[in-house]
Amino acid sequence: MKYKFSHNFISYNLFLFVFMSLILLPYSHASSMGFNTSQHKFSVRTGETRIIYPLSSVKGVSLSVTNPQDYPILVQTQVKGEDKHSPAPFMATPPLFRLDAGMRGRVRVTRTGGNFPEDRESLQWLCITGVPPKEGDVWDNSQHDKKNNMQDVNLNILLSVGTCMKLLVRPDQLRQKPEEMAGKLIWHRNGQQLQVNNPTPFYMNFKSVSLGNKNIKLSSAGNENYVAPFAERSFSLPVDMAERPAEINWQIINDLGSESQVFKANI
Protein backbone atom coordinates (compact mmCIF):
# COMPACT_ATOMS: atom_id res chain seq x y z
CA MET A 1 0.00 0.00 0.00
CA LYS A 2 1.38 3.37 -0.92
CA TYR A 3 0.87 6.50 1.14
CA LYS A 4 0.85 9.89 -0.42
CA PHE A 5 1.77 12.96 1.66
CA SER A 6 0.93 16.35 0.43
CA HIS A 7 3.51 19.12 0.40
CA ASN A 8 1.45 21.09 2.93
CA PHE A 9 1.39 18.15 5.36
CA ILE A 10 5.19 17.78 5.29
CA SER A 11 5.73 21.53 5.68
CA TYR A 12 3.41 21.67 8.70
CA ASN A 13 5.14 18.80 10.50
CA LEU A 14 8.56 20.25 9.78
CA PHE A 15 7.44 23.58 11.22
CA LEU A 16 6.02 21.86 14.32
CA PHE A 17 9.28 19.95 14.89
CA VAL A 18 11.40 23.08 14.64
CA PHE A 19 9.02 25.07 16.85
CA MET A 20 8.98 22.47 19.65
CA SER A 21 12.76 22.11 19.47
CA LEU A 22 13.22 25.84 20.02
CA ILE A 23 10.90 25.77 23.03
CA LEU A 24 12.50 22.75 24.71
CA LEU A 25 16.12 23.71 24.00
CA PRO A 26 16.44 26.29 26.84
CA TYR A 27 14.98 23.83 29.35
CA SER A 28 17.37 21.06 28.38
CA HIS A 29 20.25 23.54 28.57
CA ALA A 30 19.10 24.92 31.94
CA SER A 31 19.06 21.43 33.43
CA SER A 32 22.83 21.29 33.01
CA MET A 33 23.33 24.75 34.56
CA GLY A 34 23.41 25.79 38.20
CA PHE A 35 20.92 28.31 39.61
CA ASN A 36 22.43 30.49 42.31
CA THR A 37 20.61 33.02 44.46
CA SER A 38 22.43 35.48 46.69
CA GLN A 39 21.30 38.43 48.76
CA HIS A 40 23.40 41.40 49.79
CA LYS A 41 22.08 43.94 52.28
CA PHE A 42 23.50 47.46 52.28
CA SER A 43 22.79 48.95 55.70
CA VAL A 44 24.46 51.40 58.07
CA ARG A 45 24.77 51.28 61.85
CA THR A 46 24.86 54.56 63.76
CA GLY A 47 26.49 55.29 67.10
CA GLU A 48 23.50 57.31 68.33
CA THR A 49 19.73 56.95 68.14
CA ARG A 50 19.05 60.71 68.09
CA ILE A 51 20.94 63.98 67.70
CA ILE A 52 20.50 66.98 69.97
CA TYR A 53 21.41 70.08 67.97
CA PRO A 54 21.95 73.27 70.01
CA LEU A 55 20.13 76.09 68.23
CA SER A 56 23.12 78.43 68.58
CA SER A 57 25.66 75.90 67.31
CA VAL A 58 27.95 77.13 64.54
CA LYS A 59 30.24 74.13 64.13
CA GLY A 60 27.38 71.66 64.03
CA VAL A 61 27.30 68.15 65.48
CA SER A 62 28.71 64.84 64.29
CA LEU A 63 27.96 61.16 64.73
CA SER A 64 29.65 57.90 63.85
CA VAL A 65 28.43 55.48 61.18
CA THR A 66 29.63 51.90 60.71
CA ASN A 67 29.44 49.46 57.83
CA PRO A 68 28.46 46.13 59.50
CA GLN A 69 28.81 44.13 56.27
CA ASP A 70 31.89 42.27 55.05
CA TYR A 71 31.87 44.19 51.76
CA PRO A 72 32.10 47.91 50.92
CA ILE A 73 29.06 50.16 50.58
CA LEU A 74 28.23 53.72 49.63
CA VAL A 75 26.63 55.86 52.34
CA GLN A 76 24.17 58.60 51.39
CA THR A 77 23.17 61.28 53.92
CA GLN A 78 20.54 64.03 53.88
CA VAL A 79 18.48 66.06 56.35
CA LYS A 80 14.70 66.35 55.94
CA GLY A 81 11.92 68.30 57.63
CA GLU A 82 9.54 66.94 60.26
CA ASP A 83 7.35 65.41 57.54
CA LYS A 84 10.37 63.41 56.26
CA HIS A 85 9.80 64.79 52.76
CA SER A 86 10.49 68.51 52.65
CA PRO A 87 14.10 69.76 52.62
CA ALA A 88 15.54 71.04 55.89
CA PRO A 89 17.92 74.00 56.43
CA PHE A 90 20.76 71.67 57.37
CA MET A 91 23.61 70.11 55.45
CA ALA A 92 25.00 66.64 56.10
CA THR A 93 28.60 66.08 55.02
CA PRO A 94 29.83 64.15 53.28
CA PRO A 95 26.57 63.66 51.33
CA LEU A 96 27.91 60.49 49.68
CA PHE A 97 30.98 58.45 50.58
CA ARG A 98 32.38 54.95 50.47
CA LEU A 99 32.72 52.91 53.64
CA ASP A 100 34.77 49.72 53.48
CA ALA A 101 33.82 46.47 55.21
CA GLY A 102 33.64 46.82 58.99
CA MET A 103 34.95 50.38 58.89
CA ARG A 104 33.66 53.43 60.75
CA GLY A 105 33.24 56.98 59.48
CA ARG A 106 31.75 60.24 60.70
CA VAL A 107 28.95 62.43 59.41
CA ARG A 108 28.68 66.11 60.35
CA VAL A 109 25.40 68.03 60.39
CA THR A 110 25.53 71.82 60.06
CA ARG A 111 22.72 74.35 60.04
CA THR A 112 22.49 76.44 56.88
CA GLY A 113 19.54 78.71 57.73
CA GLY A 114 15.94 78.53 58.85
CA ASN A 115 13.98 80.23 61.61
CA PHE A 116 13.33 78.09 64.67
CA PRO A 117 11.30 78.98 67.77
CA GLU A 118 13.21 79.92 70.91
CA ASP A 119 10.68 78.50 73.36
CA ARG A 120 10.50 74.86 72.23
CA GLU A 121 12.30 72.08 70.39
CA SER A 122 11.95 71.59 66.64
CA LEU A 123 12.18 68.23 64.89
CA GLN A 124 14.12 67.41 61.73
CA TRP A 125 15.35 64.03 60.46
CA LEU A 126 18.82 62.84 59.50
CA CYS A 127 18.36 60.07 56.93
CA ILE A 128 21.23 57.68 56.20
CA THR A 129 21.02 55.07 53.45
CA GLY A 130 23.33 52.26 52.39
CA VAL A 131 23.66 52.31 48.60
CA PRO A 132 24.65 49.22 46.53
CA PRO A 133 27.06 49.54 43.59
CA LYS A 134 25.87 49.86 40.02
CA GLU A 135 26.62 46.96 37.71
CA GLY A 136 30.11 47.36 36.32
CA ASP A 137 31.49 49.36 39.24
CA VAL A 138 35.04 48.35 40.12
CA TRP A 139 34.16 47.82 43.78
CA ASP A 140 31.18 45.57 42.95
CA ASN A 141 32.20 42.28 44.58
CA SER A 142 29.53 40.38 42.69
CA GLN A 143 31.49 40.85 39.45
CA HIS A 144 34.03 38.28 40.60
CA ASP A 145 31.29 35.73 41.25
CA LYS A 146 29.80 36.36 37.83
CA LYS A 147 33.11 35.62 36.10
CA ASN A 148 33.54 32.39 38.02
CA ASN A 149 30.02 31.21 37.29
CA MET A 150 29.50 32.08 33.63
CA GLN A 151 27.80 28.72 33.09
CA ASP A 152 25.38 29.30 35.95
CA VAL A 153 22.25 31.38 36.31
CA ASN A 154 22.88 33.97 39.05
CA LEU A 155 20.19 35.98 40.84
CA ASN A 156 21.89 38.62 42.98
CA ILE A 157 19.46 40.61 45.14
CA LEU A 158 20.78 43.96 46.41
CA LEU A 159 18.84 45.49 49.31
CA SER A 160 19.33 49.18 50.05
CA VAL A 161 18.47 49.85 53.71
CA GLY A 162 17.88 53.35 55.03
CA THR A 163 17.11 54.79 58.45
CA CYS A 164 16.00 58.22 59.64
CA MET A 165 16.96 59.40 63.11
CA LYS A 166 15.57 62.35 65.04
CA LEU A 167 17.47 65.62 64.82
CA LEU A 168 16.11 67.68 67.72
CA VAL A 169 16.90 71.38 67.47
CA ARG A 170 17.03 72.62 71.07
CA PRO A 171 17.13 76.31 72.06
CA ASP A 172 19.83 77.26 74.55
CA GLN A 173 17.31 78.54 77.07
CA LEU A 174 15.92 75.01 77.59
CA ARG A 175 18.20 73.99 80.43
CA GLN A 176 16.30 70.94 81.63
CA LYS A 177 16.15 67.49 80.07
CA PRO A 178 12.99 65.84 78.70
CA GLU A 179 13.02 63.11 81.35
CA GLU A 180 13.03 65.77 84.08
CA MET A 181 9.69 67.04 82.78
CA ALA A 182 8.07 63.83 81.51
CA GLY A 183 6.05 63.54 84.72
CA LYS A 184 4.11 66.67 83.72
CA LEU A 185 2.30 64.93 80.86
CA ILE A 186 -1.47 65.05 81.30
CA TRP A 187 -3.48 61.93 80.40
CA HIS A 188 -7.22 61.43 80.05
CA ARG A 189 -9.53 58.95 78.43
CA ASN A 190 -12.17 59.79 75.85
CA GLY A 191 -14.13 56.65 74.98
CA GLN A 192 -11.75 54.26 73.25
CA GLN A 193 -9.09 56.93 72.89
CA LEU A 194 -6.27 57.63 75.32
CA GLN A 195 -5.21 61.24 74.98
CA VAL A 196 -2.01 62.82 76.20
CA ASN A 197 -1.32 66.54 76.51
CA ASN A 198 2.28 67.72 76.51
CA PRO A 199 2.61 71.08 78.33
CA THR A 200 6.42 71.02 78.04
CA PRO A 201 8.75 72.50 75.40
CA PHE A 202 10.26 69.07 74.62
CA TYR A 203 9.37 66.29 72.21
CA MET A 204 8.35 63.36 74.40
CA ASN A 205 9.38 60.09 72.74
CA PHE A 206 7.60 57.18 74.36
CA LYS A 207 9.27 53.87 75.10
CA SER A 208 6.14 52.29 76.59
CA VAL A 209 2.65 53.20 77.76
CA SER A 210 0.28 50.97 79.74
CA LEU A 211 -3.17 51.54 81.18
CA GLY A 212 -4.18 49.20 83.96
CA ASN A 213 -2.51 45.95 83.01
CA LYS A 214 -2.70 46.45 79.26
CA ASN A 215 0.10 47.75 77.06
CA ILE A 216 -0.95 50.42 74.60
CA LYS A 217 0.14 50.05 70.98
CA LEU A 218 2.09 53.20 70.28
CA SER A 219 1.81 52.60 66.53
CA SER A 220 -1.91 53.30 66.79
CA ALA A 221 -1.02 56.99 67.00
CA GLY A 222 0.71 56.89 63.62
CA ASN A 223 4.16 56.05 62.41
CA GLU A 224 5.91 57.84 65.27
CA ASN A 225 5.70 57.33 69.02
CA TYR A 226 6.09 60.90 70.21
CA VAL A 227 4.02 63.90 71.20
CA ALA A 228 5.23 67.33 70.10
CA PRO A 229 5.80 70.30 72.46
CA PHE A 230 2.61 72.04 73.65
CA ALA A 231 0.56 69.54 71.64
CA GLU A 232 -1.80 66.62 72.13
CA ARG A 233 -2.23 63.27 70.48
CA SER A 234 -4.36 60.17 70.90
CA PHE A 235 -3.78 56.43 71.17
CA SER A 236 -6.40 53.79 70.41
CA LEU A 237 -7.36 51.58 73.34
CA PRO A 238 -8.19 47.85 73.14
CA VAL A 239 -11.88 47.33 72.37
CA ASP A 240 -12.35 45.13 75.44
CA MET A 241 -11.00 47.72 77.90
CA ALA A 242 -13.75 48.78 80.31
CA GLU A 243 -14.20 52.43 81.21
CA ARG A 244 -13.19 52.61 84.85
CA PRO A 245 -10.47 54.42 86.82
CA ALA A 246 -7.04 52.94 86.22
CA GLU A 247 -3.38 53.68 86.69
CA ILE A 248 -1.37 54.73 83.67
CA ASN A 249 2.37 54.09 83.42
CA TRP A 250 4.73 55.53 80.84
CA GLN A 251 8.40 55.70 80.00
CA ILE A 252 10.15 58.00 77.56
CA ILE A 253 13.45 57.72 75.69
CA ASN A 254 16.03 60.17 76.98
CA ASP A 255 18.72 62.12 75.12
CA LEU A 256 21.09 59.14 75.29
CA GLY A 257 18.56 56.75 73.78
CA SER A 258 17.96 54.98 77.11
CA GLU A 259 14.74 54.34 79.00
CA SER A 260 13.63 56.80 81.64
CA GLN A 261 12.14 55.93 84.99
CA VAL A 262 8.50 54.82 85.06
CA PHE A 263 6.04 57.68 85.52
CA LYS A 264 2.58 57.04 86.97
CA ALA A 265 -0.78 58.76 87.19
CA ASN A 266 -4.43 57.86 87.83
CA ILE A 267 -7.08 58.61 85.25
Swiss-Prot record:
Biological-process GO terms, alphabetical: cell wall organization; chaperone-mediated protein folding
Record-annotated disulphide pairs: 127-164
Entry's localization field: Periplasm
Entry keyword set: Chaperone, Disulfide bond, Fimbrium biogenesis, Immunoglobulin domain, Periplasm, Signal
Coiled-coil segments: none
Signal peptide: 1-34
Any GO CC annotation of this UniProt entry: outer membrane-bounded periplasmic space
Annotated family: Belongs to the periplasmic pilus chaperone family.
Function of the molecule: Required for the biogenesis of the MyfA fimbria.
Protein name listed in UniProt: Chaperone protein MyfB
Gene source species: Yersinia enterocolitica
